[in-house]
Regions:
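Active-site-adjacent segment of FAD-dependent monooxygenases/related oxidoreductases
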Residues: 1-10, 93
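Predominantly flavin-linked oxidoreductase catalytic cores and closely associated redox partners
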Residues: 17-161
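N-terminal Rossmann-like dinucleotide/flavin-binding domain of flavoprotein oxidoreductases
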Residues: 7-21
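Solvent-exposed, flexible loop/coil residues
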Residues: 6, 36, 100, 193, ...
Length: 205
């Protein structure tokens, strides 16, 4: 296991060492080019620099906040409306590191639980790091104060499965991070059994 930042750093370095891949930074996409056909085909991109470029296939991998559906609609491709569902959850996380020489107490199953009013999980990473995460309803004000470090640690102390990791001498690496406004989105480029566009794909994050 690895922290997301570590994973992305390793992935980027791996990609940069691939001679068949070109990474361009600071270049924004403003729209797509298409060819006229029974099923429209996306053939290229427009950039915020005013330039454009042709491609055989385009994958919009910029996640749930992507403007890709708008790019398609702007050139007359009717994209089905996305389905959006609010998770109604707030996450609170804090990251820790164990002392050198202390092994993470990793077992063969996740360290997680659902108490009904509170979910928790311990997620281990690289180099002796791990995080403890709590999830609560975004309408339950009982745990809103858990963003306070002392309150967070008092909740950790009350959950044996989480406390075990802290008791190994873990040192906090961060304060308490919160994340809310979590929306699940479902997008499709099909209407019934028919695809609405060729040469273009969207994936989430």
């Amino acid at each position: 296991a690895a922290r997301r930042t570590t994973f992305e750093w390793v992935l980027r370095n791996t990609v940069m060492n691939n001679p068949n891949v070109e990474i361009r930074t600071g270049l924004g996409v403003t729209g797509v080019k298409k060819s006229e056909a029974a099923i429209p085909k996306v053939t290229g991109l427009y950039y915020d620099s005013g330039l454009d470029e042709e491609f055989d296939c385009i994958i919009a991998a910029n996640g749930r906040r992507s403007n890709a559906p708008e790019w398609l609609r702007d050139v007359g491709i009717e994209v089905p409306d996305e389905v959006v569902e609010d998770t109604g959850i707030i996450y609170y996380s804090r990251f820790y590191r164990l002392p050198d020489g202390i092994e993470l107490p990793v077992g063969d199953r996740l360290v997680a639980g659902d108490l009904g009013y509170l979910k928790y999980g311990v997620f281990w990473g690289d180099n002796g790091t791990f995080s403890i995460t709590f999830a609560t309803s975004d309408t339950d004000k009982t745990f809103w104060g858990i963003k306070d470090v002392e309150l967070f640690e008092s909740v950790v102390d009350a959950i044996p499965a989480a406390k075990e990791w802290i008791s190994l001498g873990a040192t906090p690496l961060t304060g308490v991070h919160s994340m809310a406004g979590l929306l699940n989105r479902k997008r499709t480029l099909r209407k019934g059994d028919e695809v609405v566009v060729d040469g273009f794909h969207m994936i989430g994050d």
